[in-house]
From Swiss-Prot:
Protein name: Large ribosomal subunit protein bL34
Cellular component GO terms, alphabetical: ribonucleoprotein complex; ribosome
Family: Belongs to the bacterial ribosomal protein bL34 family.
Compositional bias per record (Basic residues), positions renumbered to this chain: 10-45
Gene Ontology annotations of biological process type: translation
A Pfam family annotated for this UniProt entry: Ribosomal_L34
Keyword line: Ribonucleoprotein, Ribosomal protein
Gene (UniProt): rpmH
Region span, Disordered: 1-45
Phylogenetic lineage: Bacteria, Bacillati, Cyanobacteriota, Cyanophyceae, Synechococcales
HAMAP family named in the record: Ribosomal_bL34 (MF_00391)
Single annotated GO MF: structural constituent of ribosome
The UniProt record lists the keyword Ribosomal protein: yes
Amino acid sequence: MTKRTFGGTSRKRKRVSGFRVRMRTHTGRSVIRSRRKKGRSRIAV
């Protein structure tokens, strides 16, 4: 059997796609807006 190679790093995940990073740019804010509009329980990581 092969190993699961993807571990996942919380710090990197937050830095790349966290809420504060999204709010920095216009497109990021639009992402948050659209996810709120859709009714996602998690708008950002």
